[in-house]
């Protein structure tokens, strides 16, 4: 498995609604038609109005390589080029293990409890979604979550990314992506008031279904090489 994470910073934040609207059919097409695509979300960051958060999950290198040659990829890139970016940071991550965040109790676990071996210094990505039973609750929930998201990003050591955002393709869905430096930073987050406050906010809704997984990654590198070509292989190993 390969994960791509990115943050796009728009040159003009007022253009974000237009960008998200134009990206929606391209996201749906990628999810529906490209083999090996397990997640593909470009969503508005509720805590920073100029940013779009990106999370992709691909089955293997072949499926990601095929995506980089697909019209969906080129159309998405052209659209954001027309909208205008002030900056973009994108990484791909090689996944070595994955499992649910919660054990059977259910309790959030930072260690990989289903694995015999632990790699406590490897980065961990937490990703998934929350489907609200009442989609009309999503907008207010995300607005209320913005200060909690910023507090987690700014105050918790080892937090590289922490975004709960509106999936443009599903009106009931909140997309989740977090990046933590290692086991210790994620473990501390699960004992932090930010984690409990976010959980209480989500549980204040009338009902929800969720799916959260954590992914252990042993390698990350830029998506683009020095020639600005998107690479599905891990070229820094060459």
Region spans (language model):
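Hydrophobic, helix-prone linear segments
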Residues: 1-11, 15, 99, 221, ...
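Short, well-ordered beta-strand segments in beta-rich or mixed alpha/beta enzyme
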Residues: 2-9, 41-68, 124-131, 163-192
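Short, surface-exposed ligand-recognition loops at beta-strand->loop->(often short) alpha-helix junctions
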Residues: 9-19, 131-141
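Ser/Thr/Pro-rich low-complexity tandem-repeat tracts
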Residues: 14-17, 23, 43, 63, ...
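Short, low-complexity N-terminal intrinsically disordered segments enriched in polar/charged residues
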Residues: 17, 21, 117-120
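An amphipathic, aromatic/His-enriched active-site/gating alpha helix that lines ligand/cofactor pockets
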Residues: 24-37, 57-94, 151-160, 179-216
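Glycine-rich beta-strand-turn "strand-cap" elements at beta-sheet edges
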Residues: 41-47, 76-122, 163-172, 197-238
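A contiguous binding-surface segment within folded domains or other stable secondary-structure elements
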Residues: 136-138, 143-154, 159-160, 164-167
């Amino acid at each position: 498995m390969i994960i791509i994470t990115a943050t796009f910073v728009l040159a003009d934040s007022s253009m974000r609604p237009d960008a998200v609207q134009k990206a929606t059919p391209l996201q749906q097409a990628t999810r529906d038609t490209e083999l090996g695509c397990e997640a593909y979300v470009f969503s508005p960051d509720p805590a920073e109005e100029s940013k779009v958060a990106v999370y992709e999950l691909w089955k293997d290198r072949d499926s990601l390589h095929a995506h980089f040659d697909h019209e969906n990829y080129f159309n998405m890139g052209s659209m954001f080029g027309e909208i205008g970016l002030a900056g973009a940071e994108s990484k791909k991550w090689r996944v070595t293990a994955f499992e649910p965040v919660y054990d059977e109790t259910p309790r959030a676990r930072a260690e990989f409890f289903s694995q015999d071996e632990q790699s406590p210094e490897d980065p961990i990505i937490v990703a998934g979604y929350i489907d609200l039973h009442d989609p009309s609750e999503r907008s207010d929930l995300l607005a209320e979550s913005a200060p909690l998201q910023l507090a987690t990003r700014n105050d918790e050591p080892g937090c590289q990314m922490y975004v709960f955002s509106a999936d443009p393709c599903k009106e009931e869905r909140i997309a989740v992506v977090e990046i933590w430096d290692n086991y210790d930073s994620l473990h501390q987050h699960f004992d932090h008031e930010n984690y409990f406050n976010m959980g209480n906010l989500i549980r204040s809704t009338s009902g929800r279904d969720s799916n959260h997984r954590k992914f252990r990654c042993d390698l990350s590198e830029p998506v683009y090489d020095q020639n600005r070509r998107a690479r599905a292989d891990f070229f820094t190993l060459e």
